[in-house]
Amino acid sequence: MNNTRKSHPLIKIVNHSFIDLPTPSNISAWWNFGSLLGVCLGLQILTGLFLAMHYTADTTTAFSSVTHICRDVNYGWLIRYLHANGASMFFIFLYFHIGRGIYYGSYTFMNTWNIGILLLFAVMATAFMGYVLPWGQMSFWGATVITNLLSAIPYIGPTLVEWIWGGFSVDKATLTRFFAFHFILPFIITAMVMIHLLFLHETGSNNPSGMNSDSDKIPFHPYYTIKDVLGVLFMMITLMSLVMFTPDLLGDPDNYTPANPLNTPPHIKPEWYFLFAYAILRSIPNKLGGVLALVSSILILMLFPIMHSSKQRSMSFRPFSQCLMWLLVANLFILTWIGGQPVEYPFIIIGQLASVTYFFTILILMPSMALMENKLLKW
């Protein structure tokens, strides 16, 4: 008898991706974040769809429509805060997922890694445009400051900024197009995720040892489906606790003031998940230099496969490289803290030192340490 699961053209794809997929038997909880990101994306699309039913992308009514969602729509407050805090969860998992890739050498899957970086850019763009939509003070000024950075591009910069704005300042045209892009991008991200998975399933998953695990594979279902469900349970407990008890913990109070082009907030800053990049941007006292450093801080991830100089793939058995990895993590925490501080002494110099350390660790220290470890092992 034909097994539908294995013979049906559509179900067969699902079967090979989530049921009969051969998976290393030793992957740890660090491998849960991929599925958690998938759940987050689904949650964001769903809550976003319901928000879009009540939201109006017009400068005169955008702020009021968000207030209306929270006050008058059935469970509108829940949908809105799930969407806002879901974005924070999304970025936490993204950073964990990337960190796992760096630690265990998953970046040696070049295709999967590079499409992952493109996904990161797409998610960052989506989150930025979503932050503009409530049309609060920080929405307006955040949009003004960040889009204005493009004016640093030589020759075409100023024209490009006005083209993106749809006028001579951030206004109705900007809000309308940001809403359109914010709505369409998650679906493009979903398509990119499928390509990401396609490339991953070409090679199979990495594992903590970094060694070939073909001799020891187990089916994805039921072992890892159960494990993923546990991860989702922990995620939902955390997210619901955040939404129910402190929904505004990660937001900015300035965004509860309607956008006013005549009144600049004392400290313009993006959402917490962009603060590390914002700190790098601000640490260079030159517009173009800052923009280049900002883009480089993310694009540098593309260099990891090229700069991999160790004879071992994973950092599991490389204690010196592990120290550098955690130095990098600590440094990113410092950058995140600095990004939220005013531009004054001592924060300026701390930010500059942390920015230099970030690039120096990735470009010089990590490859050098890997070579030194090779020498220690007489390889």
Swiss-Prot record:
Gene Ontology cellular component terms for the protein in this record: mitochondrial inner membrane; respiratory chain complex III
Bilayer topology annotation: Multi-pass membrane protein
Cofactor binding mode and count: Binds 2 heme b groups non-covalently.
Record: residues binding heme b b562: 83, 182
Cofactor: heme b
Entry's localization field: Mitochondrion inner membrane
GO molecular function per UniProt: metal ion binding; ubiquinol-cytochrome-c reductase activity
InterPro entries: Cyt_b/b6_C, Cyt_b/b6_C_sf, Cyt_b/b6_N, Cytb/b6-like_sf, Cytochrome_b, Cytochrome_b_C_euk/bac, Cytochrome_b_N_euk/bac, Di-haem_cyt_TM
Quaternary state and interactors: The cytochrome bc1 complex contains 11 subunits: 3 respiratory subunits (MT-CYB, CYC1 and UQCRFS1), 2 core proteins (UQCRC1 and UQCRC2) and 6 low-molecular weight proteins (UQCRH/QCR6, UQCRB/QCR7, UQCRQ/QCR8, UQCR10/QCR9, UQCR11/QCR10 and a cleavage product of UQCRFS1). This cytochrome bc1 complex then forms a dimer.
Extra remark beyond the main annotation: Heme 1 (or BL or b562) is low-potential and absorbs at about 562 nm, and heme 2 (or BH or b566) is high-potential and absorbs at about 566 nm.
Protein name: Cytochrome b
Gene name of the encoded protein: MT-CYB
